[in-house]
Amino acid sequence: KAVREKHPEITVVGTVGPFYEGTDYAEGWRLATEMGVPMVDEHYYVDPGWMIHNQDYYDRYDRTKSKVYLGEYAAHLPGRPNNIETALAEALYLTSVERNADVVEMTSYAPLLAKEGHTQWNPDLIYFNNTEVKPTVGYYTQQMYGQNAGTQYITSHITLSNGQEAVRKRVGVSVVKDEATGDHIVKLVNLLPVEVSSTVKLKGIDLQNPSAVKTLLTGDPKDKQARSVTSAFVDIGGTEFPYTLPAYSFTVIRIHENKGK
């Protein structure tokens, strides 16, 4: 209360412990609710399966309580590699986080930096030595989200020819608008070992003479060297267009209106 009165520009952030459940989590949230803490810092390091099966995690949150800063998170596999499997699990989960941006106001992968030969924790996002900087595969997931965050979420749905829950949970979509540029941004994640054919339908949106660029991150699940590649997206013709999601991939399609051209 004193901080809010003296420095209203400062947001007080509480903590709810290092896990997504348990005593610290429950008591932290109880205290935050009791004290009216504006925002809480959540941490969790989980296996990719947790991220696949908990895409409704923030759907269930009470909108009247504290906002969330997801301050530490990552997908962990045995041996702690940072590879296509972990990077795509994080990309898939972030589609649901983006959908719940009214609750989750900020996120940050952790840890961020580590010097080779002097690490206490793996995986980290960016490794370096005295002469090189070595971004991981997961870095490119973060970069693709960071450069295409948007400011307005647009409700979207994806329909698959195979309706099995196991299939549905491994394909994610998020659509946002960047109000500063007017660009519409479509994010598509495919954690399946096969291609997925889709038709993107941006209902209720009027695009004038659109053009688009596509950024794609894909590879074998164990690939630790994959990098995102950006290219022109030639199939854009309006608010409805086909797109085939490659197996094990994260795609960002950024659509720009060329008004007056």
Regions found by a protein language model. Name each.
Residues 1-81, 87-89, 93-94:
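Active-site neighborhood of glycoside hydrolase catalytic domains
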Residues 133-134, 145, 179-192:
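C-terminal catalytic subdomain
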Residues 161-168, 189-261:
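C-terminal beta-sandwich/jelly-roll accessory domains of carbohydrate-active enzymes
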Residues 65-173:
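Aromatic/acidic polysaccharide-binding cleft in carbohydrate-active enzymes
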Residues 1-2, 26-29, 56-59, 93-97, ...:
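Generic recognition of flexible, low-complexity loop/linker segments
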Residues 54-55, 82-87, 121-122, 126-128, ...:
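Composition- and surface-driven signal marking solvent-exposed, interaction-prone regions
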